[in-house]
Regions:
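Glycine- and acidic-residue-biased ligand/ion/polar-headgroup-sensing regions
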Residues: 69-86, 96
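Histidine-centered metal-chelating micro-motifs
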Residues: 61-63, 81, 98, 102-109, ...
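Ligand-binding loop in jelly-roll beta-barrel domains
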Residues: 89, 103-128
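Bacterial N-terminal signal peptides
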Residues: 8-17
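Boundary at the C-terminal end of the N-terminal hydrophobic targeting segment
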Residues: 20-24
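Bacterial N-terminal signal peptides that target proteins for export
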Residues: 1-9
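A short glycine-rich, His/Asp/Glu-containing loop-to-beta-strand
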Residues: 28-63, 122
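Short acidic-glycine-tyrosine-enriched beta hairpin
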Residues: 56, 86-103
């Protein structure tokens, strides 16, 4: 292949990539953080969507509880450890997310002795369903 043909092909490839890049600038593409197949989602015609926040001081923990529907937790700061009955503890750190399964006895902890923990919680349920059921 002569120089002119190679140069022309290289120029066309460069031009196409520049056009594609220019079209993508300013366009936000969501990045997948977590995907899980879940059972136990609400099946009614209407659902209530709740977004909650929780702040844990070092050493704080939740009450021993269950949820009627899956709960998604996103960690803003610190590390969250979830202990579920019959399962190994799970720890997720800032920038990560996890799904708490329904109908499993659990408690969540900030195991750090120095760092706070902040989380955002997403809960989709039948309307007026309690967020958690405390285990006594």
């Amino acid at each position: 292949m002569n120089k002119w043909v190679r140069f022309s092909l290289a120029f066309v490839v460069l031009l196409i990539s520049l056009i594609a890049t220019a079209q993508e600038q300013g366009v936000v593409k969501p990045q997948l953080l977590l995907s899980e197949i879940m059972q136990g989602m609400p099946k009614g015609e209407r659902q209530e969507v709740r977004v909650l926040t929780a702040s844990f001081k070092p050493g704080d923990q939740t009450v021993f509880h269950t949820h009627r529907f899956p709960v998604t937790v996103y960690i803003l700061e610190g590390a969250f450890t979830l202990e579920m009955e019959g399962r190994e503890p799970v720890t997720v750190k800032a920038g990560q997310a996890m799904v708490e399964p329904p109908h499993v006895r659990m408690t969540g902890h900030n195991r750090s002795s120095t760092e706070p923990l902040q989380v955002v919680i997403f809960y989709v349920s039948d309307p007026d369903t309690p967020f958690l059921d405390r285990i006594h």
